Amino acid sequence: MNFRITDDGNERDINDIHGMLKEYNLSRREASANVPIGVFFEDETGGKLAGLTGETFGNWLCIKFLFVSEALRGKGIGSELLKAAETEAVRRGCKYAFADTFSFQAPEFYKKHGYEEVFTLEEYPYTGKRHYYTKEL
């Protein structure tokens, strides 16, 4: 046996570790499916102008990405995306929502929508901050 250190995060190594962790986790936690969720604002041709992606998992809506093109910012599109995702999450039985954002992205946006900051990574990756939020739906 030996340790191998690499800076080549190849897909096989990542999948091996992910598979082992997933098997371990499934043997010890209550059953719940990760169900993808996506809300999109599109132009007439189906081109994406804004969107939110994530998943619902048990009691939680986990927001992975929320983006609004610069030309549409400040027009309520992000708020509508978030509201639609939260409404769908409640329909799916979720009680809470989780999101994270960098200090240069949208911390005030989430606070404005009732999210409470629960943790901040300082100096991330060097001089910024990464904020973590939750909200009771």
Enumerate the predicted regions with their spans:
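Conserved acetyl-CoA-binding loop-helix of GNAT-fold acetyltransferases
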Residues: 74-87, 112
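Short hydrophobic/aromatic beta-strand element in the GNAT-like acyltransferase core
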Residues: 36-40, 51, 65, 130-132
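Conserved active-site tyrosine of GNAT-family acetyltransferases
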Residues: 17, 110, 115
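A conserved beta-strand-loop-helix scaffold within acyl/acetyltransferase catalytic domains
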Residues: 32, 43-45, 52-61, 66-69
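Conserved catalytic-core motifs of GNAT/GCN5-like acyltransferases
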Residues: 98-100, 116-132
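Conserved N-terminal entry element of GNAT/NAT acetyltransferase domains
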Residues: 1-9
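Conserved GNAT acetyl-CoA-binding A-motif
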Residues: 89-102
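A structural microfeature
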Residues: 49-50, 119
